[in-house]
């Protein structure tokens, strides 16, 4: 009886300070939420073992500091990433406007071979805040930005109320696995002559 190979996926979470990156990570991995998180210094990560589409996966989720003074640490943390999650607070327009900077910073620091097809994900967090009355970024506006960047999958989330957190990270995992498989098609030492290569396309939502 053969043993399934376990894949290690490195996921980077980026966004301004205070948008809920640490809360999302902890809600997904540990199923808990607290308001007492201290600001992340540098970077931290948690791991979670899951099975998606009959594949065993170890998720290594990196939560990086949102402060500009820590962006210079990026190259060491971003390299080898299989997926990048961009997070903004729907109640903070500036955090949404800064997504362009975070995406560009990741591409510069991580240097993915095919940036246009690298699996990004965008999460609009804190949709529960004040019953939605303090919202500054509409779902329509967020989806339009994602569409302009190559149809990046978008989820609206609440780390506090555990809304869409599991679904978002499951989609993240699938897109990262799909990207990993497609990249293998371009690696001479990884070509399986018995496998028919499927047409490459932008990873969508699950």
UniProtKB/Swiss-Prot annotation:
InterPro entries: P-loop_NTPase, Small_GTP-bd, Small_GTPase. Gene3D superfamilies: P-loop containing nucleotide triphosphate hydrolases. CDD domains: Rab7. The keyword Transcription regulation does not apply. SMART domains: RAB, RAN, RAS, RHO. It is found in: Cell membrane. Keywords: Cell membrane, GTP-binding, Lipoprotein, Membrane, Nucleotide-binding, Prenylation, Protein transport, Transport. GTP binds at residues 15-22, 63-67, 125-128. It holds the Pfam family Ras. It is a lipid-anchor. A motif (Effector region) lies at residues 37-45. It comes from the Eukaryota. One of its GO terms (cellular component) is plasma membrane. A lipid is attached at residues 205-206 (S-geranylgeranyl cysteine). GO terms for biological process: protein transport. The keyword rRNA-binding does not apply. GO terms for molecular function: GTP binding; GTPase activity. Belongs to the small GTPase superfamily. Rab family. Protein transport. Probably involved in vesicular traffic. This is GTP-binding protein YPTC5. It comes from Chlamydomonas reinhardtii (Chlamydomonas smithii). The gene is YPTC5.
